[in-house]
Regions:
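Short, acidic/charged, Gly/Pro-enriched secondary-structure junctions
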Residues: 76-123
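Hydrophobic lipid-interacting interfaces of membrane-associated proteins
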Residues: 148-152
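Hydrophobic residues in beta-strands and at strand termini
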Residues: 108, 145-147
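Solvent-exposed edge beta-strands and adjacent loop segments
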Residues: 2-70, 119-144
Length: 154
């Protein structure tokens, strides 16, 4: 069994309608993928006192936290996905995408350092973007991307 080093798991976003131009979120400290299914109550009088359910709609969302860099839309830094220097998206670009209501392509998964290069892809909207800057603390932001349509395993 290969236990994944969480440092290798990243969120990548493309805003040009091309899932081939994905960029990792800059200076990320956490990444999370949540999937859920609604259940439809199908209990009948003959269920013997036990609730019965049928599968309903599925949904998913990504969330993450990162340090804030306000120097521009992107920054050149070591990309944990590729293991080499690359262009990473900053909170400034994410703000623009949120404000415009832009649908983005996403990928959640492991890159060059991962054990199996497994990833999940789909389309999403930025549904939440918050920034925090406490006294003598590192400025951070949190982002939630809510999926629209299917999440695919790649």
């Amino acid at each position: 069994m290969a236990i994944e080093n969480a440092t290798n798991v990243v969120i990548r976003v493309a805003d040009d309608g091309s899932s081939t131009n994905l960029q990792t979120l800059a200076f990320a400290t956490s990444a999370s993928l949540s999937m859920s299914s609604e259940l439809r109550d199908s209990t009948t009088k003959s269920s013997g006192g036990w609730q019965e359910n049928l599968a309903g709609l599925k949904s998913w969302e990504l969330s993450g936290d990162a340090f804030i860099d306000l120097s521009g839309d992107t920054v050149t830094a070591t990309d944990p996905y590729t293991g080499s220097s690359g262009t990473l998206k900053t909170v400034t670009k994410l703000w623009d995408l949120w404000a415009a209501g832009t649908k983005v392509d996403i990928e959640f998964g492991t890159g060059a350092g991962g054990s199996g290069d497994k990833s999940y892809t789909g389309e999403a909207f930025i549904s939440s973007l918050s920034m925090e800057a406490g006294v003598e603390e590192n400025a951070t932001y949190s982002i939630t991307l809510t999926g629209t349509g299917a999440l695919a395993e790649a």
